Amino acid sequence: MAESMTAIDWTTEAQGVGQYADVNGLHLYYETHGEGRPLILLHGGLGSGEMFGPVIPALAAGHQVIAVDLQGHGRTADIDRPIDVRLMADDIAALIRHLGLEQADVVGYSLGGGVAFHTAVKSPELVRRLVMVSTNLRRSAIYPEMLAQQGQVRADAAAFMTDTPMYQLYQRVAPRPEDFGRLLDKIGASMAQDFDFTEDVRSLQVPTLVACADADMFPPSHAVEVFALLDGGQRDGGWIGEGRPKGGHALAILPGVTHYSIFSSPLLAEAVISFLSAQEAT
């Protein structure tokens, strides 16, 4: 898996303003770009807010983008707590309150999508709109070969990851670069836990965009499954959209990309901006 990651490019010309917020025992790093309605970005496992680099300029053109480094990732040091999307969701809710925001749009990718999902489930009053990118909501949705690869994520794999952007980013920005092995152990333990959050989908109270690659780490049918739980794909949409999902939910399957290259598609930013700009469902 490490060999396939060396070609990933998260570079961007965008220059943000970095700050820290002390929430839930974390010294949580976040970086702001642009002005406008607040938009929180939550990265994937072993990454940082820099994962969104290719799409930040487009998103920041009309929003105040707040790119967060989650627990133990990027510039946010780890604490004595498991890597758990439900706990990290509490961190994001606390950050929104810390920033004095009434509400924010929240976009999460992969691990960050799980964090975004639970933020919306647990604190719906704080989330205006939710976007989950390449996010599986049950472990069994992932292809078996990917589950096998996830089972190899542990500290002793660090030596084989030195050429990957995840390792190089961590060494460049982490408060304790020597903790990369510890992060691998904690991420590996998190991914080894069975989970199925699909029943929680029905409780979502905020408009939600489900987005994935057409060659993601799970089949597109899983995204369709989640969309169906949001009243999507149940009937013809009608001439004026009267048959679209109640609640303003949407689905986007992006062509020609994978779980790892999805940020390279200009369609990702377009889909997110279009969804966030849509009128509230009645």
Language model region names:
Residues 217-223, 234:
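Conserved alpha/beta-hydrolase "acid-adjacent" motif
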Residues 26-77:
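Conserved HGGG/HGGXW glycine-rich cap/lid loop of the alpha/beta-hydrolase fold
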Residues 14, 67-107:
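Active-site loop/oxyanion-hole signature of alpha/beta-hydrolase fold enzymes
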Residues 1-39, 62-63, 277-282:
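Alpha/beta-hydrolase fold catalytic core
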Residues 204, 210-212:
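Short beta-strand/loop motif that positions the catalytic acidic residue
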Residues 114-122, 128-167:
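Flexible "cap/lid" loop of the alpha/beta hydrolase fold
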Residues 242-282:
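Catalytic active-site module of serine/aspartate enzymes centered on a nucleophile-bearing elbow/loop
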Residues 184-200:
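Active-site nucleophile elbow and catalytic-triad environment of alpha/beta-hydrolase enzymes
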